[in-house]
Amino acid sequence: MSTRNPAQSHWGVPKGQRTELYVYNTLTHSKVPFVSNGSNLTWYCCGPTVYDASHMGHARNYVTTDILRRILQSYFGYNITFVQNVTDIDDKIILRARQQYLFEEYKKQQGTNKSHSEAREKVTEAWFAYAKKNLPEPPSSMSEWPQWLASHDIPTLAINNPKLPMHVDALKSALDALQVSEASEIISLDGFWPKVQDVLVPLLDAELGSTVTDPAIFRKLAAYWEDDFNKDMANLNVLPPTAVTRVSEYVPEIVDFVQRIIDRGYAYPVTDGSVYFDTEAFEKGGHFYAKLEPWNKGNRELIAEGEGSLAALTGKKRPGDFALWKASKPGEPSWDSPWSKGRPGWHIECSVMASALLGSNIDIHSGGIDLAFPHHDNELAQSEAYFDCPQWVNYFFHAGHLHIEGQKMSKSLKNFITIKEILKKFTPRQLRLAFLLQQWNTQLDFKETLLAYVLNIEQALENFFRTVRALMNETEGVSANGGHVPEKFDKLEIELLEKFQQTQQNTHLALCDSFNTPLVMQHIDNLVTQANIYIREVGQQPCSRLLGQIASWITSMLQIFGLDENGHPNAVGWSSSKGSSSENTDAMPYIRAVSSFRDRVRELCIAKASSQEILKACDIFRDYDMAALGVSFNDRPQGSALVKLVDAEELIAAREQKLEEERAKQAKKAQAKAEQEKKQVERVMKGKTSPSEMFKMFKEYLSFDEAGLPTKMRGEDGSEIDVPKSRKKKLQKEYAQQEKLHKEYLSYIESNKS
C-alpha cells in the first residue's frame, strides 16, 4: 500500500502582490499565501464525465467550488474567468452507450419471439459468465446458488472486494427473473428485462460491441446526461461557468498538443497506434512527476483506473506511463490522427482545454480529491511538458470526500444518492448550509445530526430576520404617523454594536484563513443570539436601525455564500426556499381582509354584542384571515402587538396544531368529567333504597319500629328474640349512612327532572 514518504516537489510562490488571504494548496498540502497578478484570476474546474445521473458527491464538489468562487469574487473582489469542461469522450461513456444500445436492440429483437426461449438461454449463459468473472469460486449450476450464498460471508468478503455485494445482487435479480419466467412460461417485459440487464449487457457487449459504429449513439448518451447535469447545477444555485469546454469539440487541438509533447521527447507512440507519456523522460528532463500525491506514484490500481476499462496497455515502456492517445478498437468512436484512428486519453483532455483558454499558467485548478492522482498529477505533467515550464498551476483546490452516515459513496457500488433524490428531502439552501458547516477541503459525513443542526440554524436565522423586519416596519409606521422614534445608543445598544463590529472582523479573519466558512457561520450564529438577547432585554422599543444593519450584513454574507438565489442588495433576510419572498407586496388581499373584519365588528356593535363576542371576532381575524395571508400578530404584555410577515403555510400549520392540542385537552377534560359523573351516579344509586325499607328485605328480621329499624329477629334455634344491643347499634349506624345516601339520591333525581 502506498505511503506518504516521498517528498513533494518545490512549489513556487507566484509573482504578484501578497494579500491577507491564505489558502490550502494541495501542491504543498498546507496553507500558503494567495498571490495574484492583479484583480483578474483564471480558474479551471474539472467538470463531469457525462454517462449517468449526478449524485451527492458531485453536489459536494461543485457546490463547494461554487462557494469558494463566490467568496473570491464577491467578498475579495476578484474578476474570475471560470472554465469548466465536459468529458463527453471516455471509456465509461463508450461502454454505457454501447451496452444500453445493444440491450435495447436485443429487447426489440426478442419482442417478436413469443416463446422467449432464446432470451432465457441467453440470460442463462450471461448469468454463468457474470458469475465466473465476478464471484470467488462461482457455483457450477444455478441449483447450487443457495448453497453458495450460505457458504460465503458476503460482508466479510466485501472488505477486500467492495463490488461483491453489487455482483451478488445482480445475480440474485437475474436468477429470480429466470425462475419466474420459467414458471409462467411467459416473459413480462416490465418484470423480466430490468432484472436481467446487469448480467446480460456484459455478454451482449462482448459478442456484439464491435458492431456498434454509429457515433450518434455515443453522443446521444453524453448529450442527455450533460443536460441533466446542468439542470442539477441550476437547481443547486451553482453559478454557470464563464466558458464550457466539451472534449469532442477540441480533438484537433488535442492531436497538436500530443504531437508537441512527442517532439519534446516526453511521449512515444506504440505499434497499435496509441501514444503514451514517458514519465521517466519527463523527470530526467528536470521536471517533477506526481506533484500532488507523490506517494501514489507507484499505485498500479489507481494508475489502471485512470487509464480506463477499455485501455489496451500494449507497448508501454513502464507501468507508470499513461495514455495520451488511444487507438480505437471496433465498437469505439474514433478520430483521425498521425498515429491511428483513435481518441484522446482522459488526462490530456483537460490539459488541452484548460491551456486553450487560460494559457501556460493558471491561477486555480479545482476538483474532487479523488482526482488528485493520477488525473490531476498527469494533467500537470502533460502541460508542463508541453510548455516546458516548472509550474502550470499555482493553486490546486480539492474538495474533500463525501460520506453518507459514515459510508463512502460510489457509483460502481450503486449506493449513491442522486441530486434529484436528495432535493426531494432537502432544499438547495439546506444542502449548501450543510457544506458551509464543514471545512471545504476535509471529509464531510452527511448524517442526521448534521442535518438537524442545519435545520436549527436555518430556522434561527429565519426567525431573526422576521423579527427584525417586523420591528423595522413598526418603526416606519410610528415615523409615518408622526410618532417619536428614539435613536440614542445606551449601554445595551453600544454592547450590541461592539459585538457586531467584532463579528465583522472575525468573519474577515476566518475567510482569510483558507475560507473557513464553519467558523464564519459560528460567528454569525453567535451574533444572532446576542441580538435576540438584546431584543428581549431592551423592552418595548429596540433600536431597529442597528438591528436592521446587523440583519442586512448577515444577509449579504449569506448571499455571498450563494444561500439566496433571488437576493438583492440591502435586503433583510433571504427569499423563501420556493424562490419567492414571504413578504407579499400585493396589498389587495390584506385590504379585503381588513374590510371584512370591519364589517363584522360593525355588525356586532350595532347588535350591542358583548365585549367577549367582539374579542372572539378579533381572534378569528388574527388566526384565520391574517394567517392565510402570512401575517402574524404577537401580543405583548403592554402596548400594541408585534406584527410579523411569515409564510402562510407555517402559520396555518401552527394554528391547526394549537387547535388540535386544544381539542385533545377538551377531550381529556370531557373524559375526566364523564368518569367523575359515572362515579357520582354509582354512589347516588346506592341510596335508591329508603332507609325505612333497607332491612325489610332480610328474612332474619321479623318486626320493625316506625323508622324501619329491626326490633325482633330469629334466634339460632329459630325462635323470635329481641335484637341484641350490639346488633342494634350496628344497624343504627348503617341506617344513618343509608339515610344520607337516600337524601343525595332524592336530591339528584329532583335536580335532573328538568
Swiss-Prot record:
Belongs to the class-I aminoacyl-tRNA synthetase family. GO terms for molecular function: ATP binding; cysteine-tRNA ligase activity; metal ion binding. A motif ('KMSKS' region) lies at residues 408-412. ATP binds at K411. One of its GO terms (biological process) is cysteinyl-tRNA aminoacylation. Binds 1 zinc ion per subunit. This is Probable cysteine--tRNA ligase. GO terms for cellular component: cytoplasm; cytosol. Residues 664-686, 709-736 are annotated as: Disordered.
